[in-house]
């Protein structure tokens, strides 16, 4: 798809109010948001994705937090990606698992797995309280080409699911969840490895992973998938060890427990 054509209607962007950051304690987040609608939705989504935006329903958003640049857009350059010994082991462990690319239609089977994952991994988060109607909206409210990658074992049991957008230069992992009772399978890692392989098989150069946030237990893992690229000062460039060290320093906790109460971490 060629998205170089001009958009024939104005695009409006809005800034949200401040709210507690879901990734780093003691920080506040703000977002810039815009609606993805109309005949140019695919073109707009492609452009916004390359500019560091993410999609939720028919909304594209990006962080604009005052005094904080912790959320770094990251993508894997799949043609240069190489399997480590650990990742080969993960693939072998899941040799009997098959991936199916299915339409973005919510099922109760998916939702039951989604609930188990949320309660186990993110029990204190807003998504843990989602009902089936909310889950269906997350999956099906999309103005662009979206599907679900389902991972099933040899008994056809659903082990993992990844809501996935298709861009003109890659795949975008919107949200993934998996069986929390099978840690030996490393299903989260296996899903990423499978998506890397799928992206490459489709002749596309990038797998977009969303935001990398150093020192966040939810988001820090993404820098381990290299070679990767990050969006820095408006341009994509290779992620370096210096970037990782710099982000780890910038995202260290603002508050930490001490014997006398709380410390600001500024000593």
Swiss-Prot record:
Principal subcellular localisation of the protein: cytoplasm
One GO cellular component term: cytoplasm
Top-level class of the enzyme under EC nomenclature: transferase
Subcellular location, record wording: Cytoplasm
E.C. code: 2.3.2.29
Domain of life of the native organism: Bacteria
Keyword Acyltransferase in record: yes
SUPFAM superfamilies on file: Acyl-CoA N-acyltransferases (Nat)
Keywords from the UniProt entry: Acyltransferase, Cytoplasm, Transferase
Catalytic reaction equation(s): N-terminal L-glutamyl-[protein] + L-leucyl-tRNA(Leu) = N-terminal L-leucyl-L-glutamyl-[protein] + tRNA(Leu) + H(+); N-terminal L-aspartyl-[protein] + L-leucyl-tRNA(Leu) = N-terminal L-leucyl-L-aspartyl-[protein] + tRNA(Leu) + H(+)
GO molecular function, one term: arginyl-tRNA--protein transferase activity
A Pfam entry, by short name: ATE_N
Disulphide bonds in the chain: none
Renumbered residue ranges of the record's region Disordered: 246-267
GO biological process, one term: ubiquitin-dependent protein catabolic process via the N-end rule pathway
Function summary: Functions in the N-end rule pathway of protein degradation where it conjugates Leu from its aminoacyl-tRNA to the N-termini of proteins containing an N-terminal aspartate or glutamate.
Database matches in PANTHER family: ARGININE-TRNA-PROTEIN TRANSFERASE 1 (PTHR21367), ARGINYL-TRNA--PROTEIN TRANSFERASE 1 (PTHR21367:SF1)
Similarity section: Belongs to the R-transferase family. Bpt subfamily.
NCBIfam families in the cross-refs: PRK01305.1-1 (NF002341), PRK01305.1-3 (NF002342), PRK01305.1-4 (NF002343), PRK01305.2-3 (NF002346)
Protein name from the UniProt record: Aspartate/glutamate leucyltransferase
Taxonomic lineage of the native organism: Bacteria, Pseudomonadati, Pseudomonadota, Alphaproteobacteria, Acetobacterales
